[in-house]
Amino acid sequence: MKIERVDDNLLLESLIDKATQLDNITVAVAVAEDEEVIEAVVEALKRNLANFILFGDNEKINTILNVKHKDQQKSNKSLTVVHADSNTMAAELAVRAVSTKEATVLMKGNIPTSVLLKSVLNKEYGLRTGNILSHVAVFEIPDYDRFTIVTDAGMNIAPDLEEKAQMIRNAAAIARAIGIEYPKVAPIAAVEVVNPAMQATIDGAALTIMNKRGQITGCIVDGPLALDNAVSALAAEHKGIQSEVAGRADILLVPAIEVGNVLYKSLIYFAKAKVGAVIAGAKAPIVLTSRADSAESKLYSLALAICSVNK
């Protein structure tokens, strides 16, 4: 059955409108010499989304800017290119720019994630807060009436109970930044009952109690829930599940990175979903998209990161 999306605020495009209302936003891009990255940057400039500092090979960056994007429109936002001799140097310069408040958002360019994260986690100039860093993806799914937030599809391999609690806090902060004031969180498992042989069900139940006891705040957690029960009220009703979260989950907390990664890519490639994603838990939002992600996805991720500044 097709579900009509009646609220334009539940479109990723609306995040771009929200982001343009925020002042003094500067994005530092590490190793910016990539066509998809620069296409997203140029589109963001066209929409007056943010100022940009592009770190990387000056010649390669300017070649892409000047040859591939000759028709870029004038913007009231600034674009600066800073040369770096290596990926490592570009990552350090970009992270330092955010650490010193020269920039407010960090964006990954054509650089291995491990190289960028090494700078992000640097004890001298990095962006560590003591909290776990986690991947938070916001999906706009065709024929579905709400944003769907998935965590974690790209950072934490096999999180334990406390790490899952921190991942919920990170995802809930992102949810509030995009207008979901009191997000509903479903810890996902294969079944919706506790099975001592399935750690995901035990953790889901524990997280629910932690939420009820005030150890996880600013959201409502109920689990474990199977995916169908989390997103379909009809499926939950058929199984007799009475819950404030079942069928209405805003955040899907997956038990392991394999589950998150497969769900993430299935939504994009099979369901034709649109997505924006950030790394939360650092001193500033980090846009850490895959090098295979489209320019559109990178633009939505930028808008999501900007909306979540200081949240």
Task: Label every model-predicted segment.
Residues 1-245, 250-254, 259-311:
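Anion-binding alpha/beta catalytic cores of soluble intermediary-metabolism enzymes, centered on
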